[in-house]
UniProtKB/Swiss-Prot annotation:
One cellular component (GO) term of this entry: ribonucleoprotein complex
One record GO biological process: translation
One of the record's GO molecular function terms: structural constituent of ribosome
Keyword field contains Cytoplasm: no
Organism: Pseudomonas aeruginosa (strain ATCC 15692 / DSM 22644 / CIP 104116 / JCM 14847 / LMG 12228 / 1C / PRS 101 / PAO1)
SUPFAM superfamilies hit by this protein: Ribosomal protein L36
Protein name from the UniProt record: Large ribosomal subunit protein bL36B
InterPro entries: Ribosomal_bL36, Ribosomal_bL36_sp, Ribosomal_L36_bact
Lineage: Bacteria, Pseudomonadati, Pseudomonadota, Gammaproteobacteria, Pseudomonadales
Length: 50
């Protein structure tokens, strides 16, 4: 899975590519051709509670 700064071209690589937001990150997933998977961003840091 590649880490990219921009997902604009990544979502246009294949007609089955979808943009999904999970845990504060943006993912491009492609079930028919998994080599097009990529991610953008970092998750927000978790707040430690006592």
């Amino acid at each position: 899975m590649k880490v990219l700064a921009s997902l604009k071209q990544a979502k246009l690589r294949h007609r089955d590519c979808q943009v999904v937001k999970r845990r504060g990150r943006l993912y491009v997933i492609c079930k028919s051709n998994p080599r097009f998977k990529c991610v953008q961003g970092r998750p927000k840091p978790k707040i430690k509670r006592r």
